[in-house]
Amino acid sequence: MITNTFIEKTKKKIARAEVVSFDIFDTLLLRPYLSPRDLFLHIEIDQCLEGFAFARREAELSARKKNPDKQEICYDDIYNEIEARFASAKKIELDWEFMVLQPNPEMKILWDYALELNKKVIVISDMYHSYEDLSQLLIKNKFHDFAHLYVSSRYGKTKKKGTLFEQVFHDLQVKPQDIVHIGDNKKGDFRTPAKLGMQAILYKQVTHQFLAINERARRFTEQNVSSLGKSILVAMLAMRWRKQTLQQERAQYWEDIGYAYAAPLAYGYSKWIETTAQQKQLDHLLFVARDGFLLQKAFEHFHCGEIKTSYVYAPRLLNLVYRLDYDKRNIEHVQTIVDFYSQKYADIRELRETQSLIKANDYHQFIQSHKHMFERYAKDMYADYHAYIDTIVDPQQNIGLIDSKTVAFTSQKMLEDVLQRPIQGLYWSTLLPYRTKKYAFDAFIPNNLNTLDPNVFTKNWKFVELLLSSPEFSIQGVSQEGRAIYKADPGTDEYVIKENYTQITKGAEIFYADLKAIFGQTPVYIEGQELVSWVNIFCDHPNSHDIKEMTKIKLAVDASHDRNMPLFSMQTSCLDFFKQPKVTLNALKNIAWRTPLQTLILHILRPIKVKRKPAKQLKISFFPYLKVQYFVWTFSLFKRLSCQLSLGDDKKHSS
């Protein structure tokens, strides 16, 4: 177990003290927000109280200005100043505090330690809430057996002024130096009590501790404007981090990935799915394997309505081989069909062995030459698939299909063909708009540019697909009984992913449990663009542990799942450079993450990249695989040739 130096040092001071005093907010109790004011924003959004967050802040300021003689105001003073239309929020806000406030496990250790030593434990808070409410909050969060609770709103005195501490000295007849006080406010919990002679311990808020050691979370909070979803997500990650640092066993890498990335993505996307499905009056949602696995789990965890869900198999491979729906010019399409049938049917395999098939047209002609055989087998398989879907879907239901990204709408096309009626597609986003006119669909993040925009699909869409996937091997078909027919000989890469995905699912389930424990069924409003930004920061800022773990991950890039490519990083050895120097270098150029040694080798062996463009343009890049572009110089040579010289990342846009 890693030693917590703060706890150990504080325990020593507690052991020598007569009285141990704790602050409440951000010390004993934690709010699941980066800022306490985000609680007001959450209430405003969830309760449809437009303008409440601002009005609540202004009411508190007004109450303090109107009571200059009071060191502290009370809760009633605030709501006496607020607009009448927000009067109902008085109870809502207090109920919300009871719902979301969580015990700080670090403080619970110190609290219990002080009680074990028979120290007098007291609580001192500068707060407008009442003594009764704060007492109940402490007891609800397992902070029992405190000897006294001092609340500024009750005494009209504060810690910041020192008067509330003086009240403690008087009541308990104790010397200041015999009291240890722990709190997070620099003035009220540290400077003032220290001046009075108390043993003051300044506690750094959990979110501040977390942001100090987690670069990605820090970048996320600093990026663009603050938002409710971002505030809640980072605060939850901070609270999980705090719990983990106090446990003897740390979570596995992929469990952490599931908690921090897979679960928030699935949650945010599934809440949009729920809202859209309700607007479209859909009765039954079909979550398409394998990208729908975690989405369905998230939906079922937090959906309170009566929309039915099913997990169905409808990958693009099945559309190719069951319906023979292919582009004859696409080598991947035609080769996948021929290879699939050759492996499954001996007569087609024998015919295939007599042919030399190289180009797309060769495969197409082979299919056409033996069309009757392909169509007969396809008809039988498609009949089984039809029977499988019929056991799931009621003819009277309004159907929604859930998938991640789509280009050709293959799953929707196949299911509409089976059901013989239109269905509603719900996607993260889509590509190629000319294909969308045939299908009814909505997108979580509309793709206005109709490209693989990193602000829509993230900087590595394969990573998102991995996060939303399932602990299954690739699917080669579906039996009439509805059982998935998996690939007969999955490779090592698929076994690694399946094993890791079990941990991803575990992390996601813990996130959902934490979310429910704090908020119940109250939505937390994590928006699509925030999720994209969060994933992109992961893609841009890996640490050495990320790079090491991701070297094991290769994902399929074809419909038949026969060709795999590294997701982020790869392992290389000196032998690789001697055996296959060109192949190894090309692979290094194309991966997103490299070790320092790999980067150095790439810079030494490929220091310059030259590109000749149409219209007499020449681009020369020095050290093009650096992560940063340091300069770009564009000039005209003899008024005939436009030249561009750059140092650093050649993929950056330049003028």
For the regions a protein language model found, what residue spans apply to each?
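Short, acidic loop-to-helix structural element flanking the phosphoryl-transfer center
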Residues: 72-123
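Long, low-complexity, Lys/Arg-enriched
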Residues: 166-172, 180-182, 191, 195-655
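Substrate-recognition "cap/lid" segment bordering the active-site pocket of phosphatases
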Residues: 122-124, 128-178
